[in-house]
Design a protein with these regions (language model features):
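N-terminal beta1-alpha1 cap of cysteine-dependent amidohydrolase-like domains
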Residues: 1-180
């Protein structure tokens, strides 16, 4: 199913050149409670699949419920042929709106700037982005002061994601006024 997309990415990357593109691979690094460890094999296999389609990721973003220690990062780096600092941890987040802050904390911005811009161009990115408004948005989202019950009538209401766009729009509409 994904083959046409992978081929399009491969062709685009060849046309743009390595200094004008960056490929990030998002992968799950599951924690197996029975073994008490994070498993990197699924990540290694998915990168090998990408390689079979002619794509070598520049960064690997590792979703996980547990932190990646230095040994896990080293292992992923070694077996997936990426720099160790390009192995980015993405811990499970309470809300998707936390993801930009988690990525910032992992240094992905600096990694992207280093990869795509010359040293002279990098000066434009020397200042830290002001994320105060985003942090305020998150605070309001996670700590509503008022709750308003809303009934949703539909055919598939028992399926949690059936009306996801509607429920998400209600949530977002309430954020400025700290309403849930």
């Amino acid at each position: 199913e994904a083959q046409p997309y992978l081929e399009a990415i491969r062709q685009l990357r060849n046309e743009l050149g390595p200094r004008n593109s960056l490929t990030s691979h998002l992968t799950l690094v599951p924690y197996l409670r029975a073994a008490g460890e994070l498993k990197t094999k699924p990540t290694q296999h998915s990168v090998k699949e990408l390689l079979a389609h002619g794509l070598q990721p520049d960064t690997i973003i590792c979703r996980s419920e547990r932190s990646l220690d230095a040994d896990i990062r080293r292992k992923i780096s070694l077996f997936c042929n990426v720099d160790q600092e390009a192995v980015i941890q993405m811990l499970d987040a309470e809300t998707i709106y936390e993801v930009p802050l988690l990525l910032r904390d992992e240094g992905i911005g600096e990694l992207v700037v280093d990869r795509l811009f010359t040293e002279q161009e990098q000066d434009r990115f020397a200042t830290t982005p002001d994320l105060d408004a985003w942090i305020d948005f998150l605070k309001r989202l996670k700590n509503p002061t008022v709750t308003i019950p809303i009934a949703l009538v539909g055919k598939y209401v028992e399926h949690q994601d059936a009306y996801k766009s509607i429920t998400e729009s209600f949530i977002l509409a309430g954020v400025p006024d700290e309403v849930q």
